[in-house]
């Protein structure tokens, strides 16, 4: 991205259970010329997404009569899936083989590596390690906004990402 864009760049970070992955992402972002870091704290666990339940969307996808009919009506989807480039989590592929090839492994990676127990000490560690413009995304209260400033955040981001996760 740094090679093709002269605009400001922000890296969105999630804390991993394996500290070396988090450290590597921060270090690589700095070396790649990112200007700011944003730690996302509002989607650490998957929510109850009611629309997905209504439409039958699952991860990993389940073969149902409806999905089989969709595949049959769109054979190019199946062809592209079977012959195309396999999905990979490029940022962490050197650290893990999870997140490659099939949707199930992406979810396994998120469940195994994203740390739902991360707290203020983790956020402070990331802000200090980054040592530059640092935002906390998903702040939900005035008290949390003040705490974010206290640990070294230079910005906060208020979003409905986590709300959507929790509310469906």
Model-derived features: positions:
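Active-site entrance/lid segments in N-terminal catalytic domains of soluble metabolic enzymes
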Residues: 1-150, 154-155, 162-165
